[in-house]
Curated annotation (Swiss-Prot):
Cofactors (names): Zn(2+)
UniProt GO molecular function: metalloendopeptidase activity; zinc ion binding
Protein known as: Protease HtpX
Annotated catalytic residues: E148
Keyword hit for DNA-binding: no
GO BP: any one term: proteolysis
Keyword Acetylation carried by entry: no
Entry keywords, A to Z: Cell inner membrane, Cell membrane, Hydrolase, Membrane, Metal-binding, Metalloprotease, Protease, Stress response, Transmembrane, Transmembrane helix, Zinc
Amino acid sequence: MMRILLFLATNLAVVLIASITLSLFGFNGFMAANGVDLNLNQLLIFCAVFGFAGSLFSLFISKWMAKMSTSTQIITQPRTRHEQWLLHTVEQLSREAGIKMPEVGIFPAYEANAFATGWNKNDALVAVSQGLLERFSPDEVKAVLAHEIGHVANGDMVTLALIQGVVNTFVMFFARIIGNFVDKVIFKNEEGQGIAYYVATIFAELVLGILASAIVMWFSRKREYRADEAGARLAGTNAMIGALQRLRSEQGLPVHMPDTLNAFGINGGIKQGLARMFMSHPPLEERIEALRRRG
């Protein structure tokens, strides 16, 4: 909770600085001179409230959504040797990482994958696919679990949700400025907000949203390297490298992880060209090389 409060305070400061900067550069005067009667401070606050509300709401229901979207079965009483080993391993890794034991689950998927989610590092969920448990060695599974525990311990779910809230705020803010400018200045509409405002705002939100996604995914890729480092500390560098190499050998298999969980899975799939800007994970080769350099 402290992380959320500090981040919200930081971003309130960012919003205030943005508002002051626009005023200093005479943006309000420019808009008014062109017939746009727009209170930028009120607009910025409005966008911040709605931008963060959606992001934080998604964060708080993330565990429930993850269970529903992946059909994850939570292990409360282990029924098999695999389930018992899984609970014991997660408990051990959590203790070493200094966090409370998360919920542990298995989701039905042939692909080798895993994810972590939850609004709080002491109230999280870690789940692995049936395929990963069946085909990976115990050391490889432990390394994957250590990576996911690393996400939880680093507070990555909260951090990315708040970053998403920031970009949501500015996408909404600038899209509405563009919409007003097009409506009032280009189309000379003097009677409320015309159709040009709505069309321009929607189009601007789409374009700015795509650009904002690239920013969020850049942060996500950075968090993956940190989770790999945490996995290497908890399970051993060789085991972490071995798990990533094993994942690389299965890259041809389709990934069925919901988009909302991709950023916190171990395997993010493959993209080429400009599409790499929108990858939630760095290429496995680069992650392996980073661990080798780390030693």
